[in-house]
């Protein structure tokens, strides 16, 4: 807050720590975590570089020209921040890197990190378990036919659910039928 006439202002608090893509940042418990072009960072009042034991593995093969595809998510069930990203030879997000922010890093000076390869699902969005009992995510399907989300959870039970938002049908009833909302 800077007062009249501008009310609010911006103050630069870090350098060489910019965001790699608009969806590559997440906030949990007042701390922001993000993936930059050259490392992982957090902000809790000051910018911190996150020591990362897998940083070379991630950044030696990431396609930084596809930064807008990178997305971040939180898994509160395991105190994890997850980033999905494309590798140099991939068209879509084919890998992920996970940071466990809840573990005591005194015994792990490089932090608690692990990586994985997306073999069955190319993640593009994620919502934490604060809304539902478990996290929900979507996957990208590059086939040339239309695709619809497979919903895991209370009502989806792994079934493909068809939403026709263009014509107003967006309610799926427990018996599988749809109701047009007007």
Segments (PLM) and residue ranges:
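Beta-sheet repeat architectures centered on beta-propellers
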Residues: 16-31, 37-182
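Surface-exposed extracellular loop regions of Gram-negative outer-membrane beta-barrel proteins
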Residues: 1-14
């Amino acid at each position: 807050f800077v007062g009249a006439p501008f009310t609010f202002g911006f103050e630069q608090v870090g350098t060489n720590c910019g965001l790699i893509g608009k969806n590559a940042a997440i906030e949990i418990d007042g701390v922001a975590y993000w993936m930059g072009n050259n490392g992982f960072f957090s902000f809790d009042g000051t910018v911190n570089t996150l020591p990362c034991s897998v940083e070379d593995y991630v950044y030696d093969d990431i396609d930084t020209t596809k930064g807008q595809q990178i997305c971040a998510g939180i898994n509160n069930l395991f105190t994890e921040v997850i980033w999905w990203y494309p590798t140099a030879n991939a068209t879509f997000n084919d890998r992920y890197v996970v940071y466990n922010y809840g573990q005591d890093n005194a015994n792990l000076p490089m932090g608690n990190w692990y990586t994985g390869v997306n073999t069955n699902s190319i993640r593009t969005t994620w919502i934490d378990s604060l809304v539902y009992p478990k996290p929900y995510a979507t996957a990208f399907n590059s086939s040339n036919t239309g695709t619809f989300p497979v919903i895991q959870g209370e009502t989806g039970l792994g079934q493909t659910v068809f939403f026709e938002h263009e014509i107003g049908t967006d309610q799926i009833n427990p018996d599988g039928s749809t109701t047009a909302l007007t």
